[in-house]
Amino acid sequence: MDEQRVDIVPSPWHEGERRIQQRVGVADRMEVFGRKVIRDFLPEQHRAFYRQLPLLLVGAVDPAGDPWASVLEGQPGFIDSPDPRLLAIRARPTAGDPLANALEAGAAVGLLGIELHTRRRNRLNGTVAAADAHGYSVAVGHAFGNCPQYIQTRDYSFARDPASAAPTAIESGTSLDAAGRAAIAAADTFFIASYLDPEGERARRGVDVSHRGGKAGFVRIDGDTLTIPDFAGNLHFNTLGNLLLNPRAGLLFIDFASGDLLQLTGSTEIVFDGDEVRSFQGAERLWRFTVRAWVRRRGALALRFAFGEWSPNSLLTGSWDQASARRAAESLRSRWRPFRIARVVEESAVVRSFHLEPADGAGLPLFTAGQHLPLRIGLPGHERPLLRNYTISAAPSDDLLRISVKRDGLVSSWLHAHGAEGTAIEARAPEGDFGIDPTIKRPAVLLSAGIGITPMLTMAHRLHELGR
């Protein structure tokens, strides 16, 4: 009986979401999971959550078909849920907001409630059921929670009464100016709105708005094109699924200190693989956004936020400078390169760890958990350098090469006796097929003995990073 019901209940995912889930091998699992966690009503916990928020992220589509992301704000309590299928918002877009005329009765909207000081967030997709001079009522289509990854904590305060109109300088353009590029370059957070009209039917339109975070500077700027790494997430692919079928998107960058809002609309392209993806630590794919229009509203937000802590997930990701250095290192992959010992750590009476850094100005080579590092070391009394392989005991996200060596054998004993900070050695790019697929969710038992624990440590570290 239950199996028959699963067959007739519509999938919680649309075609674009399913296609990306299939691409990464999680479609069947996510079909079951989605039916459990995506609801057509607000659970009581979500209703209470929205009531305590001072802001709400909104995604919608303007009359020209361009999506925009924006924000509504108010004292906690400005959002209410009179019943589980309705969210009431007592706020409207402020002067100059591209969504000022888009949030009318019948309009599809995406909402994101985010509590920055706790990293909690919940999402809602629905339709504006009613609109008046004071705000909106939104009928729930889908409601679901999101994980707290990549959210930097911030504490909020109000610089003025959010209900009062503030004089706002409004600027706009079609090509990013210096101020816009500076705001984006400094950002560790932004929000993206996307939408899809299934089979071209506007009446079935669905809009999403979601959060993106990383280290400051994780958005690369090339003229009017932004490149954003896409990190491991909840595998819903709501945003990327929309972009796969409809490349239009709207971005919102908030200056948390000044209340300035920078809103962009434009088109996107998803990059699923390639050297750029592989070289950016933590990226599972990339996407590019080309600006078509922008609006900047200085001081539009009454809220101000004080930075708290970095998300641990953000700190595990790379940077564009690191990615560039890694690509340079990849071009040298088949060559012996000069390295130096940067640090020596006494792990036990018989094991020392050696931290290695490139001495040629190029970056660290890419590697996967479980691979080994070929070394070439010249020893006194030997005409030719000796070759040895040592398992890398650092995780790929550690931004270092570390080998942990037991004092046993000719080269290993020499490293213990003579390896010190500044000692020069040669290494080639990491090699080996021994490893574990961190994307597969199934129990794993790692067995090792003695110094053989080194590949297990890096595999366990990698699995922990990805929450497996």
Q: Locations of the language-model features?
A:
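Short, well-ordered loop/turn sites that connect or cap secondary structure elements
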Residues: L103-A105, I184, L243, F367, ...
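A short, Trp-centered hydrophobic/proline-enriched beta-strand micro-motif
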Residues: L53-A60, A108-G113, A187-P198, A249-L251, ...
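C-terminal edge-of-domain segments
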Residues: M1-Q52, R121-T227, N242-N246, S258-L261, ...
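Short, charged beta-turn/beta-strand-edge "cap" motif at the junction between a beta-strand
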Residues: E115-T118, A143, F256-S258, G378-H382, ...
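Short, structured beta-strand-loop surface elements
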Residues: A64-W68, E73-D80, P84-H134, G206, ...
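Histidine-anchored nucleotide/phosphate-binding helix
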Residues: I392, I453-G467
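Ferredoxin-reductase
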Residues: A329-A424, R428, G435, K441, ...
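A structural micro-motif recognizing beta-strand termini
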Residues: A91-T94, F231-N234, T290-R292, L356-A362, ...
